Amino acid sequence: MKTIVLLFVLVLVFALLVKMGMVEAEHGCPDNEDECHEHCKSIGKSGGYCVGPHKQTCRCN
């Protein structure tokens, strides 16, 4: 039962991160912030930028 609850919480956290516009590094970060920006625009956001300790996460706004 604990395993199921933990799995549910992890899925919920992941879904919230996606909903907040955090997308993993495959969208140009950290080397090409313009690619991140264009990706975010392509999904209906106003743009995006690379964030995190090593700027590996594309955050859409």
Curated annotation (Swiss-Prot):
Expressed in which tissues: Highly expressed in non-venom gland (hemolymph) and moderately expressed in venom gland.
Which Gene3D superfamilies is this protein grouped with? Answer: Knottin, scorpion toxin-like (3.30.30.10)
Domain of life, source organism:
Eukaryota
Q: Which GO terms describe its biological process?
A: defense response to bacterium; innate immune response
* Disulfide linkage: C29-C50, C36-C58, C40-C60
Arranged from A to Z, the UniProt key words for this protein are: Antibiotic, Antimicrobial, Calcium-activated potassium channel impairing toxin, Defensin, Disulfide bond, Immunity, Innate immunity, Ion channel impairing toxin, Potassium channel impairing toxin, Secreted, Signal, Toxin, Voltage-gated potassium channel impairing toxin
Tell me the compartments it is located in.
Secreted
Q: Which region is the signal sequence?
A: 1-25
Q: InterPro entries from the entry?
A: Defensin_invertebrate/fungal, Scorpion_toxin-like_sf
A GO cellular component entry from the record: extracellular region
Q: Name one GO molecular function term.
A: toxin activity
Tell me which family the UniProt entry assigns to this protein. Answer: Belongs to the invertebrate defensin family. Type 2 subfamily.
Function in brief: Antibacterial peptide active against Gram-positive bacteria, but not on Gram-negative bacteria. Also has weak blocking activity on Kv1.1/KCNA1, Kv1.2/KCNA2, Kv1.3/KCNA3, KCa3.1/KCNN4/IK, KCa2.3/KCNN3/SK3 and Kv11.1/KCNH2/ERG1 channels (tested at 1 uM). It inhibits potassium channel current by interacting with the pore region.
Please identify the protein, giving its name as recorded: Defensin BmKDfsin1
Q: Which organism is it from?
A: Olivierus martensii
